[in-house]
Amino acid sequence: MANNPEGATKEEPRDLKVERISAGAPGQGPEKPQVIVAPSADVLSGATSTDVPDLGEGTYLAAYWGERPTGGYSLAAESARLEGNRVAVRLTLKKPPRGAILTQALTYPYAVAVVRDLDPRGKRFSFTDQNGTDLGWPVRLVS
C-alpha cells in the first residue's frame, strides 16, 4: 500500500487469480452478450437460475457471449487485474476453425468463474477479449 499526497491509502495494481467453474454452449441462453457479477456462488445461482458450485470466497461471474449461429464457439475467463476500484477481466472467445464440420443449431456460449481475493462491492468491471479489445458488454452486479 502506498500513500498518495492527501494521505489516503491507495492499493497497488495487482493480478487476481481466476478459477474456472464451468463453460459450455447450450441450446438456450441470452441472445446478446452480457456478464453477471455476484459476491457469492449462492447469489449468482439465484441470478442465473442455475446451480453454481460454491468454491469459497471470491467474486463469482457468469459471462454470456450471446447467440451464435452454429456449434464450435467457446468462452473462458482467463485473467483479472485490479487497479484502484476497476477490475479488468480478460475473456478468451474462440470461433470454430474455418472449414470445420459444425452443429447446425443456435448455441449460447458461456463461462462461469470465481475471481479470488476480491470483494465486488464498489468495483467497476470491464471485460476485454484475448487481444485486449474492450468488449463493451453490459455488466449486471447482483447482491
Stretch-by-stretch model annotation:
Residues 1-143:
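Exposed, flexible binding/inhibitory loops of compact, secreted disulfide-stabilized domains
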